[in-house]
Amino acid sequence: MENEASVVQFQKVVGTRYVLTGERNTERFRKGYRSGFGEAICVIKPGTLLELWQVLKICVASDLVVIMQAANTGLTEGSTPNGHYDRGAVIISTLRIDTIHLLDNGKQVVCMPGSTLYDLENQLRPYERQPHSVLGSSCIGASVIGGVCNNSGGSLVERGPSYTELSVFAQITENGELQLVNNIGLELGSDPETILKSLDTTDLSSVNQQQTDKKASDNEYSKIVRDVDADTPARYNADQRCLHEASGCAGKLVVFAARLDTYPKNESEKVFYIGTNHLEDLTEIRRTILSEFNTLPVSGEYMHRDIIDITEKYGKDTVLMINMFGTQRLPTFFALKNAIDTRLNKIKIFSNITDKLLQQLAKLWPNILPNQLREYQNKYEHHLILKMHDEGIDEANKFLDHFFSDRTGDYFPCSENEGKIAELNRFAAAGAAIRYQKLYSKDVEDILALDFALRRNDRDWFEVLPADIDEKLIHKLYYGHFFCHVMHHDYVVKKGVDIETIKSEMLEILDERGAEYPAEHNVGHLYAAKPNLADFYKSIDPTNSLNPGIGKLSKSKHYADT
């Protein structure tokens, strides 16, 4: 009855149509993008920041667990409920609150909690500027604030994790009181209602900006990533340097708005495709470019031959779709696909039907990889997709020409189409592994996906697993952001193998190597938070009412059972 009363209150604030109840109506919000599932009384979809504040006040008064959710594209279950809680739980979906304000001709932006990277990219285009992340998460509708809350990384070498010290957020205090904090550096008023009404209705480009030395991006990262002799990783989720209020909060605060730097578009860019059978070649390329070039790469993506093979076959439809229609249709496509899967997967004969259909359709299409990429795929085990910009293009051309003059590896400057397809093939890699799992579910127990950061001075970066682990795997799929030494490993595990056991063995190996994990997907409910990260979560959410249980911490009120 108490929960029913709360639902009625929510309906009065946001309207009946924006409060979803019942298992079927709420399932797609309670189920994670890759994995994860939990209970929720309802899903609430406020349309303004003031409505969000009013909903939060009801939640606090009713002692409810709150799961904040935007695009629900998290890969480690941190965007959804996790099983059962000791209190009732609600999901607050912020996608209706998607306003973006441009400051100083687009040099900075203020983003509301439902704004997406795709929309931000579009709004910045006339100003010849870019958001923190491009091509990748933006293609599946990821939110700007979700990236900030999880210190999301990405492929762009110069930018580091998504970070800001300028935000407006709500916090539940030790005494269980809800308070609003305005640290965004804009004069918006003094009380919560006035501040939020200002954010909801005011043109922020005309609002007085307070003098502040607070950062709106990780502007130190380019120096950090260049230090190739440091014995620590360049970036990872538990890095104390990037845990500040909204940044890294992982839903333990309710973020109403964040102020972020944007980046000028490069005048020119060029992709170089590198292939080799010798790991030390890529090691020397990375160390030389980072430490000696005047211009840092735009990106440098590593792919092992095995993941290229898998992606060419099982990620082909994704590459085709983006190549033909662009990225703008992908969020709608994925939303439609997920809605169909949610309904049909309950019927055994229709399980994974959309993946099976898409796979068959892709087979009818001719090979999409350009000939020279295919030649390198057959010839070389290790591949690097290096994108340089402006003066760095000439630097890379001269260096690579000299570097491979006496080595068996090789490189070539890509045409526009070759570079585009190479990058799209890398983007499709993670989805290709999941497609493989769904098509061969009788043989596959699960995909164990690990993202981790190696030390910057690691020369022995390629993994060789012990035989007793290797024999439990169908495929080992290796790719990553090579210059940042952030690696993504997808292990296709044989049927019948205990996933938690093999994961524990893998993490022990990473510990021995001095790696940090996760690097950029955050702990969610799949990784244990390191002590400093756990302390950060507890300090900003002392009652454990917001996203309880992440980092494998207690789900109980006040962390009672830890």
Region annotations inferred by a language model:
Residues 48, 73, 107-108, 115-120, ...:
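Short, structural beta-strand-to-alpha-helix junction motif
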Residues 81-116, 155-159, 177-178, 260-264:
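Glycine-/small-residue-rich beta-strand-loop submotif within the FAD-binding core of flavoenzymes
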Residues 33-35, 39-41, 64, 69-71, ...:
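Conserved glycine-rich FAD pyrophosphate-binding loop
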Residues 23-26, 30-97, 111, 131-134:
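Glycine-rich N-terminal segment of FAD-binding domains in flavoprotein oxidoreductases
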Residues 125-280:
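FAD-binding subdomain of flavoenzyme oxidoreductases
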Residues 142-149, 301-317, 423-425, 522-535:
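Short, conserved secondary-structure transition motifs
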Residues 265-299, 306-309, 313-360, 369-403:
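A conserved active-site cap/scaffold subdomain adjacent to cofactor or substrate pockets
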Residues 19-23, 45-46, 66-70, 77, ...:
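General beta-strand structural signal in soluble alpha/beta enzymes
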